[in-house]
Amino acid sequence: CKFSNYLKKLNLKKGDRVAAYVPNKIETIISFLACAKNGIIWSSCSPDFGAQGVVDRFKQIEPKVLITSDYYFYNGKKINILDKVDEVIKQIPSIEKVIVYNYYKKEKENLKNFIDFEETLKIETDESFERFEFNHPIYILFSSGTTGKPKCITHGTGNVLIEHNKEFMLHCDIRDNEKLFYYTTTGWMMWNWLVGGLATGSSIFLFDGAPVYPKIDICLL
């Protein structure tokens, strides 16, 4: 609720778009749910994407805010993506503000030109909720880009909620006392599917990294 209130302070309104160039971590879930609470349309790419791949997607939707991270992890390595973020910002003129997750708390100098996500949580909480239409867009996904630039695919909130609940509760038999894991990144629609599991009351497990590091069965532990 604090982050959703911060988005209001940035004058983001229902129907505005927020683009997220982010790893699969708890801050990403918070950001997505805050957007949904405010009727803001979410769209995400994973940080392993190159800058041009991100631009090809996000430039189409004209986001006002970009949410990103200073680093992500893969194969035991921390990988800085802020140079790619700078390139994305240069090519998408609609971006007015950039909010960054600070993975390494001692490296605050990385964030001097951006808004530190932790600072956004120092605002007061707003627990009020507004009702939106059944088919109000909740997020924009993209086609693979194999036949030209990726194409936008908009999903309605009510449709997504019903479909995901059907799949989790009837097809997968997920209940509110269970834990749900699916290896994915934020650039794949399965991340959106995984987050939908929260509607069942289950707990979801997030994993940022390679599925075979440090050993082949890491995701089975």
Task: Identify what each model region corresponds to.
Residues Y21, C45, S69, Y101, ...:
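Generic beta-strand/beta-sheet core signal
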Residues S4-V55, K179-T184:
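Conserved AMP-binding/adenylate-forming
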Residues S31-A36, V85, G196-L198:
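Short hydrophobic alpha-helical segments of the AMP-binding
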